[in-house]
Amino acid sequence: MSNLVGLLGIALAFFIVIFFTYKGFHLAYTVIVAVMVVFITNGMPILETFSDIMLKSGIDENGNAFVSGVATQAKTLLPLYLFGAIFGKLFIDSGAATSLSGWLLNVLGKNADANRRRLIGSFCIIFMNAIFNYVGVDPFASLFTMIGIATGVMAEVNIPRRFMPVHLVLGTTIGTALPGSLAVPNILCINFLAEYNTTSYAAAIPGFIFVVFVFGASMWYINKMVRKAAENKEDFEYGPLQPANLTGENLPPVILTIIPLVIIPVGFSTIFSDAPWAAMAVGCIAGIICFGRYIPKKDGVSRIMTIADSMNNGVTIAGIPAIILLNYTLGYAIEAAPAFGTIVELFTNLPGPALLSLAFMGILLLGAAASASGLIIALGVAATVFIPILGVDPNAAHRVLLVSNTVLDSLPFSGAIVALMSIIDVKYKDGYPQIAVTTVLFTFLGVILVAALLILFPGLA
């Protein structure tokens, strides 16, 4: 078939994923339909190609054995999802999250006026969610935890509920973009660029600059909007949410809540640099030791079974992001499509520095795919074209694509945004503009800043 039909098929596949998930169809089977559209419009044998994108092994042109496909990501990501979800449940069920956020609020907000307490409350919510994502707890697994914590903090400092979505989305963005993060996008970058030996700290200085810029600009903007709401006499109201308990006699000491949060990233950076899930598993063990005994017991239930129940609930939650692994099939399918070569040619022939072209490709592909498939496609092109042929530094490519991943992942039709708005019961016109400014506009400017730094000062890679 012609490249035009193939390109139209790729565009239609993106539309199917975006439209039907927005309408409430589950991502798992919607993606499979989109993959079939790519196969058919590109004249690809359906059964054979589907098997190959799930798992393919063989001998490359240099005589080396290789394995590729979605299954190669599953071996890293499935245990990370599992232990991340378990850790998240232990952290919330024990009251560790409430203890840490309450301590931050009380220490930083002591003797502060109303405006400063609101600013500190915003910081606490964003910081807590960033920590969850930084240590590898999947956003889906931490969603309900953070809604509970954010509700309690926002009620305490009187920030209107319509600002809750931007706090949670921004925290996810910051935690994902931080150098050393165990967030899935960072792990994907490591996996796809494995032959170039990039690490989670690739181009760390530009990465930290990105986080400081986005966080600083966003805090300024959020504080400005919250102050304006206060001047208009807007108050917090619970709506469908229940308040989180920020006080209690049986909460774990703050020091015990911090220990596992230190162990996980340190373990990932040292002993378990090739196995992020192992660092998370050790973090779970540390969590059980540090605050497992603080999980409230039910009458007649032993301490061991109380901890086991919390872990069991974590396993159940882990199934949500695990199913989303199927979403990666779209990225592999598009990368294998003959028409994809035309897309690659378009981006590689853009005028200007190749790294900037890679950044724009990452942003647009993620926005079009509305999922991690866009990042997978961009990483594949980076590994096969931009790095070996166009001479882009692997560490620079890693960092630029990771931060590019944060720009269009929070569009209105994003599954996480739709879920947040629904659960919190906030109308788009009330809650989305703040998200658009902070995690779309500011992150876009941050990507340009990172690319410019790495182009002007290549030694930062």
Describe each region flagged by the PLM.
Residues 1-84, 89-94, 101-118, 224-236, ...:
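N-terminal alpha-helical transmembrane segments of multi-pass membrane transport
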Residues 2-14, 31, 41, 205-309, ...:
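Long, contiguous bundles of hydrophobic transmembrane helices that form the permeation core
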Residues 23-27, 75-77, 88-99, 132-145, ...:
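Short helix-coil transition sites and intra-membrane helix breaks within transmembrane domains
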Residues 54-99, 276-277, 285, 289, ...:
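Core transmembrane alpha-helical segments of multi-pass membrane transporters/permeases
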Residues 76-81, 202-215, 275-281, 396-405:
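Alpha-helical transmembrane segments
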Residues 80-84, 110-149, 327, 350-390, ...:
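Hydrophobic alpha-helical transmembrane segments of multi-pass integral membrane proteins
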Residues 115-131, 157-174, 199-206, 353-366, ...:
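Alpha-helical transmembrane segments of multi-pass membrane proteins
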Residues 151-251, 416-454, 459-461:
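Membrane-core helix-loop-helix motifs of multi-pass transport proteins
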